[in-house]
Amino acid sequence: MRPLMLQGHERSITQIKYNREGDLLFSCSKDQKPNVWYSLNGERLGTYDGHQGAVWCLDVDWESRKLITGAGDMTTKIWDVEYGTVIASIPTKSSVRTSNFSFSGNQAAYSTDKAMGQSCELFLIDVRNADSSLSEQEPTLRIPMTESKITSMLWGPLDETIITGHDNGNIAIWDIRKGQKVVDSGTDHSAGINDMQLSKDGTMFVTASKDTTAKLFDSESLMCLKTYKTERPVNSAAISPIMDHVVLGGGQDAMEVTTTSTKAGKFDSRFFHLIYEEEFARLKGHFGPINSLAFHPDGKSYASGGEDGFVRVQTFDSTYFENIFE
């Protein structure tokens, strides 16, 4: 089946995310304007206009009422999903690299970059009664990162912990009540982590790393369960909600991309079996590295956002579901 090509960004995509029902697909890019799309037919429903810099991250809450974005203009913004208005704008001292709502939607976490003389910090805010006064309020928790900066983040079960992936390949779990690290993965990855995504039940998560591998980890112990090997840096990885499949996307850094790379299959979405660690399919499409991947919550399609500024939504054929691994 032909993929839907969503063209609404002028610069490279930084992150894409479905809401819980899967009817909305959110995308953000370096062109300052996050978009929301109707995932079934690729219609653009709206644009969230307000940032003055590249938008690095976004997340939508459980009820699809609020959207949080973090950008290079040194702000985190919380938006009304339906009306596209800014509920709150929180100033920071450096670029915001990650932002996530907790599962309950009561809290949000975001992290800042190690830049401009500022160290990387992890912040927690209460967003239950979010309004414009949030910009003056102190965060409920603030954890400075003494070692490597945070490049990706997930909420742990029951909103009690936060899992962070770092620029040196380290993964850590933080207890948000005590404000301290409780588990450290050590050196499973030898280079920076670009992306982390949970499985549907939250017991596992997959990482995508610059060390050319993606790995499956246990969410509580941070034990490395599986490794998916490729030949080039992995920018994003996602776990299928219905099949034992993992999809990986990446390519070289944007600086190193040459015109021959598309033919060489360097920008394909690559499908691996979750348990057997074997690659079984590739899908072409992007004219540059894939920066973000997301499975639809029903598992029947997936979306990819690339350095070329396109978001592609690919629906699986029936043969995909009949393919039993032997």
Swiss-Prot record:
| Pfam families associated with the record | EIF3I
Superkingdom in the source lineage: Eukaryota
Kindly state which keywords UniProt assigns to this record, in alphabetical order: Cytoplasm, Initiation factor, Protein biosynthesis, Repeat, WD repeat
Classification via PROSITE patterns: WD_REPEATS_1, WD_REPEATS_2, WD_REPEATS_REGION
Q: Where in the cell is it found?
A: Cytoplasm
Say if the entry is tagged with keyword Transcription regulation.
Answer: no
Q: Name one GO biological process term.
A: formation of cytoplasmic translation initiation complex
One GO molecular-function annotation for this sequence?
RNA binding
- On whether Coiled coil is a keyword of this UniProt record, the answer is no
UniProt WD repeat ranges: 8-47, 50-89, 145-184, 188-227, 285-326
| Signal peptide segment | none
Q: Which GO terms describe its cellular component?
A: eukaryotic 43S preinitiation complex; eukaryotic 48S preinitiation complex; eukaryotic translation initiation factor 3 complex, eIF3m
Q: Which family does it belong to?
A: Belongs to the eIF-3 subunit I family.
User: What's its job?
Assistant: Component of the eukaryotic translation initiation factor 3 (eIF-3) complex, which is involved in protein synthesis of a specialized repertoire of mRNAs and, together with other initiation factors, stimulates binding of mRNA and methionyl-tRNAi to the 40S ribosome. The eIF-3 complex specifically targets and initiates translation of a subset of mRNAs involved in cell proliferation.
Q: How does it assemble?
A: Component of the eukaryotic translation initiation factor 3 (eIF-3) complex. The eIF-3 complex interacts with pix.
The identity of this protein, by name, is Eukaryotic translation initiation factor 3 subunit I
Lineage, please? Answer: Eukaryota, Metazoa, Ecdysozoa, Arthropoda, Hexapoda
